[in-house]
């Protein structure tokens, strides 16, 4: 369409300049986005055009300073060509996009041609009176105005999509060599069929239930099952042997004996005695937290209900009531008598009297070494003072209860059920005399 065919309104739209104070707003039809604008072109795009919003152009353009903040100014960088003027396989020449940054562009010129490995050179744009072609962008109302000044005097460079595709193909071509190198390295590190890996390179996971005994010369990494191990150490830290008159460390036995066999052995050795699962309140941390829970345990025990049979400590492989911590010594002196010992020193507790006076003298009394440096803190429980069977201090022998005789009608299990024993009363068991 010739300019003479336009009316006055259309001529006003075509005669605008990007630097005008007021741009035309009575635009009836916007232009399609142009990828290669050239030769002093003018375009009016919709403000909703994504490409216009991003100020895209297939020419290699970079932002330049402009005194007018409302106008975005971009100048052309030219094109990078091969110094040997080589041709690609498709029969076309190599036209690369110049880098936007000045330092990157200088570095790019020192690289080699991707096709013939020849030198690269930059052809600058001088299409606007000896200066680069300049593009102007301006957002005004519902439209985006574009104006190009100058005519490009160099070939079109490759588009951004073509440049990305070329880089991807280059990575694909170099990938097989890198994969072969990685496979070669993996075969070198792979052990031979006759070789065995050392213990130092194999991490081990050890728990108490597995019963694993590590060699003394082992120096590898050990990943311990700390929650379960700590809880088991609370129950099996110490044991007292009345028959042998010494101290037996259960942790040494559990390292060589299967836990199930150890459990059955302890259960067999305590079959002739009274099990503490029905007599003693729980001593593990977290089972009873206050005085009210202890009273509830005493009431349940009075009704013949085992409260611990339903609530098992999650870190124990067996319920707490199933560990046979007995009161009386074994009839066979060759079998070790295991007894639950406190984790705190008896001297630090003022309200810890002996269970009954020892009329037979120091028959089974002996000093037991207790590790006071244990990191597990045992909760302190206070026995209810209204308990009619609460024992008093050892300094008042006239207030202590005597041991019931064999002819007494009270059953020993029923009698001990009413006792509110806690960690404090567990210390009395060290000086326990024979009950029968």
From Swiss-Prot:
The keyword Cell inner membrane does not apply. Pfam families: GCM. GO terms for cellular component: chromatin; nucleus; transcription regulator complex. Zn(2+) 1 binds at residues 76, 125, 152, 154. GO terms for molecular function: DNA binding; DNA-binding transcription activator activity, RNA polymerase II-specific; DNA-binding transcription factor activity; DNA-binding transcription factor activity, RNA polymerase II-specific; histone deacetylase binding; RNA polymerase II cis-regulatory region sequence-specific DNA binding; sequence-specific double-stranded DNA binding; zinc ion binding. Residues 171-202 are annotated as: Disordered. Transcription factor involved in the control of expression of placental growth factor (PGF) and other placenta-specific genes. Binds to the trophoblast-specific element 2 (TSE2) of the aromatase gene enhancer. Binds to the SYDE1 promoter. Has a central role in mediating the differentiation of trophoblast cells along both the villous and extravillous pathways in placental development. Polyubiquitinated in the presence of UBE2D2 and FBXW2 (in vitro). This is Chorion-specific transcription factor GCMa. Residues 174-202 have a biased composition (Polar residues). Highly expressed in the placenta. Expressed in trophoblast cells of the villi. PANTHER family: CHORION-SPECIFIC TRANSCRIPTION FACTOR GCMA (PTHR12414:SF6), GLIAL CELLS MISSING RELATED/GLIDE (PTHR12414). The keyword Transcription applies. Zn(2+) 2 binds at residues 82, 86, 113, 116. It comes from the Eukaryota. InterPro entries: GCM, GCM_dom_sf, GCM_large, GCM_small, Tscrpt_reg_GCM. GO terms for biological process: anatomical structure morphogenesis; astrocyte fate commitment; branching involved in labyrinthine layer morphogenesis; cell differentiation involved in embryonic placenta development; gliogenesis; positive regulation of DNA-templated transcription; positive regulation of syncytium formation by plasma membrane fusion; positive regulation of transcription by RNA polymerase II.
